[in-house]
Amino acid sequence: MAVVTMKQLLDSGTHFGHQTRRWNPKMKRFIFTDRNGIYIIDLQQTLTYIDKAYEFVKETVAHGGSIMFVGTKKQAQESIAEEATRVGMPYVNQRWLGGMLTNFSTVHKRLQRLKELEAMEQTGGFEGRTKKEILMLTREKNKLERSLGGIRDMQKVPSAIWVVDTNKEHLAVAEARKLNIPIIAILDTNCDPDVVDYPIPGNDDAIRSAALLTKVVASAVAEGLQARAGGGNGNKPEAEAAEPLAEWEQELLAGATASPTAAGAAPGTPEADIQTEPTAPQNP
């Protein structure tokens, strides 16, 4: 059974790229066509690259590795936290702290401090202190929880990282590359494919697209964990109820089993979550 279907990708708006004036020429090979000034990503290639990334993640985890989930943009925060938590992997969905990978020894000390403060709060360690001291300690704990809560159990740098939007997460990407940590990431039409080891061409601005692809990676982790434990297959992402496809999108879907052809019908209105900038109706 396929890891994910063409229909699921279309339903989630994974095929919508940025406006044609905002692109990285290196992404040309991943572009199928453009419609009304918006690039349309070649989902046939997306499916192929998903399979490659899925296999890599599954094998990495099956052999004892870990995957860090990274996505701090608003559209990705919820799915990053949910899917990483589901499979017990570390995640960063708030601000990326410089040195989180390259200076992990210092970060680990801050994690120990977080656990120390939590233990104090739970065991009555705040008793006997002034209100001001308790307030300061509570603020410190909350700040550490917000920035490091997703990696609280991480004992070493991850084996690979999953990234939603390599442009926004350029610090994480740079640190991973410096340490030769493999990068799996969504590649929108404004991204640089040269910085990613396992690219997945797709829309990194739509909530449903980011959620679907993050779920795919988490499912690969789950399957790897089961293989590590000697179990069966992991849970594959399930199709969700979606709006009817526009006629041109149906043509893309119909062409999935044949040679792709440019669609000629007018595009439908994509989901409201595809674009976060108020000046453009679709992923710019």
Swiss-Prot record:
InterPro entries according to UniProt: Ribosomal_uS2, Ribosomal_uS2_bac/mit/plastid, Ribosomal_uS2_CS, Ribosomal_uS2_flav_dom_sf
Protein name as it appears in the record: Small ribosomal subunit protein uS2
Span list, region Disordered: 250-284
Biased composition (Low complexity): 250-272
Family per similarity comment: Belongs to the universal ribosomal protein uS2 family.
UniProt keyword GTP-binding, yes or no: no
GO annotation terms (biological process): translation
One CC-aspect GO term: cytosolic small ribosomal subunit
Pfam families linked: Ribosomal_S2
Classification via Gene3D superfamilies: Glucose-6-phosphate isomerase like protein, domain 1, Helix hairpin bin
Keywords: Ribonucleoprotein, Ribosomal protein
Ribonucleoprotein found in the keyword field: yes
